[in-house]
Amino acid sequence: MRCPYCGGLDTQVKDSRPSEDASAIRRRRICPDCGGRFTTFERVQLRELTVVKRSGRKVPFDRDKLQRSIDVALRKRSVESDRIERLVSGITRQLESSGEPEVTSEAIGELVMEGLKGLDDVAYVRFASVYKNFREAKDFEELLGRLSADQQDGAVPQAEADRPIGAGPPSEAAQPAAGEGGDAPMRRARSRA
């Protein structure tokens, strides 16, 4: 692995361990030439995906770009990094296991919106405003109206935020008990932490 600091080719692995969700191997490396330390991640890649942009242009799928987009939407929000990683990994797994070699940027955007909607309302609105190219205040009003209606209908239980995209229906244990609000599982999870 090339050193990102000096370009040296002979870096050494000092520590290897699985990531928290076991979807990657985290390796701490050191460069004997400059002494630089850095971290790399090794992940399974099921297939090469191509993203078809709105313009028709085709580019390779970039997991890091997906991560950055989600990070921008979640900037200054109190969402744990492992939940963000589960969201990114879940979207990536769903795309790779779809069986299709090409995926539209619109499909990726919809998956991100679905994931953010269950994770953080503010991040969902931020992402949607850019993704849907909002031009006027009424665009925000319509989205917020739908979001409020969905929450009143219980369409997006907060407990689903911990479930990766594409993981199937939530178990009964993840559903709020009778009389509990949709955020009760989150309160229980925080009290355990």
Swiss-Prot record:
Protein name, entry field: Transcriptional repressor NrdR
Zinc finger (unnamed): 3-34
Annotated cofactor note: Binds 1 zinc ion.
Residues annotated as domain ATP-cone: 49-139
Keywords of this entry: ATP-binding, DNA-binding, Metal-binding, Nucleotide-binding, Repressor, Transcription, Transcription regulation, Zinc, Zinc-finger
Tree of life domain: Bacteria
InterPro entries tied to this protein: ATP-cone_dom, NrdR-like_N, RNR_NrdR-like
Transferase as UniProt keyword: no
Region (Disordered): 150-193
Task performed by this protein: Negatively regulates transcription of bacterial ribonucleotide reductase nrd genes and operons by binding to NrdR-boxes.
GO BP term, example: negative regulation of DNA-templated transcription
Record flagged with keyword NAD: no
GO MF entries: ATP binding; DNA binding; zinc ion binding
Family statement drawn from the similarity comment of this UniProt entry: Belongs to the NrdR family.
Taxon lineage: Bacteria, Pseudomonadati, Pseudomonadota, Alphaproteobacteria, Hyphomicrobiales
Cofactor: Zn(2+)
